[in-house]
Amino acid sequence: MTKPPTGATADPLTVLTGMYAAEAEYLAAGGPGAASFAPLAPFFSPDVVLHQADALPYGGTWHGHEGMERFFAAMSGVWESFDMVEQEFLATGETGGPAVVLTRIRARARATGRELAFPILQTITVTDGRIAEVRPFYWDTGAVADLTRLP
C-alpha cells in the first residue's frame, strides 16, 4: 500500500508519485464500488478541484474528496480499461508553479469496446503537501467522446 505524504513538508514530486501509485492500486483493486477511496484521499486537499473538459463524458468541475470519488465512478463507467502506459514529469512544481505531467494512455471504452491511445497533459497544483487543483488537457476530446458513445 502506498504511503500518503507527511504534510506540508512533502515535496510535490513525492506527492505526485505517491498519488499515481495509490491511484493504480485503487484501480487494480476494482476502483469505485469495489475499492476504498481512503488510500487516495490523503494525497488530495479536502478542497481539491478537478477541472475536466466539458466535451468529455465525465466533463465538468469536481470538488472535494466526494467530488473525486464521483469523478472516478463516472470515469470508470466510461472506460473498461484505462492504462497509464508512460508518464513523464515535465515540471515538478518545486519552484512554486504547478507540476506538469505528460501521461500516455491506452484505454478501452466500455460502451463500444473500441480502444484509443492518447496523451493527457495535466497541470497539478500542490499546496501544503496535498494536491489542490488538477487541470487535465486531452489532445483530442472529440476523439475520446466519439469513441465512448454508441452510434
Where are the model-predicted features located?
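C-terminal and inter-domain tail/linker signature
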Residues: 1-151
